[in-house]
Amino acid sequence: PMDFSVNSAGVATSVNFTNSLKSKSESDITVTSLFVQDQMDLTDNVKIMLGGRLDSFDITVDDIKNGTSESRTDDRFSPRAGLIYKPQENVSLYMSYSESFLPRSGEQFKALSATSARLDPDVFESTELGIKWAMTDTLSFTASIFDSEQTRATYDNDTGENSEIRGLHVDGIELELRGQVSDKLQLAVGYSSLEGTTSSGGVAREVPDHTFSLFAKYQVDENFGWALGVTQQGESHIKDNSTLIL
């Protein structure tokens, strides 16, 4: 049996719940956003969607441990566009493009050095092609292929200039079959395949090669229902360019 009282080296583990927690950094973030989107009918079978989001992202990170503080403000416009073609009433073919960005303070907004504070945010460009097919009144199928690429700024210590490099690249496919089995039971089966590549050509972290999912929803009556879902993921790597598997 597993013994949680000791670690892998056989040393007793303990947690002190009486000491005060010590923060390594504190972040102050202010975000102001404006989002606009419109869909227009070009013909009876063709629709176009245009939109965008304007963000003002202001962040200050205080490094309590080292006694430093860095700030940065990013004002960026992220466009998005889509084209929908309906060859028949129950089938839609679509293509979309969108951009998003992530400040250089990272996903948790907890690290901002003097170098990263002078760099532009990471920009993510995503394109997608897909189909949505209402096979019957109670059965639908969707499929898509997509590609997402990260562009990030880097600082050259020798020249003192910024430049852009290609970062994370992810492409893949997604499939889903959704059906109303009975008046009360709905099922959805999904599958996705992803491939992630780092800027150096290695394998990206936490990108599962295959994912299967099954979700069920049962409506007992108009006031009560339950749902159950199962997801199975294939192999993914612990960190970028690593051979270690989760």
Q: What would you call each of these model-derived segments?
A:
Residues P1, T127-L129, S213:
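Glycine-rich, charged/polar anion/phosphate-binding loops
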Residues P1-D3, T60-G67, S105-A114, R152-E161, ...:
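Outer-membrane beta-barrel translocator domains and adjoining extracellular loop/strand segments
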Residues P1-K22, A114-R118, D156-E164:
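Surface-exposed loop/turn segments flanking beta-strands in extracellular/periplasmic regions
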Residues N7-S20, F124-E128, G172, E176, ...:
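Short C-terminal domain-edge/linker segments immediately following a structured domain
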Residues S25-Q150, Q180-S182, G190-E195, K217-N223:
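Structural signature of Gram-negative outer-membrane beta-barrels, strongest in the C-terminal barrel
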Residues T43-D44, S140, I145-E149, E164-N241:
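Gram-negative outer-membrane beta-barrel transporters
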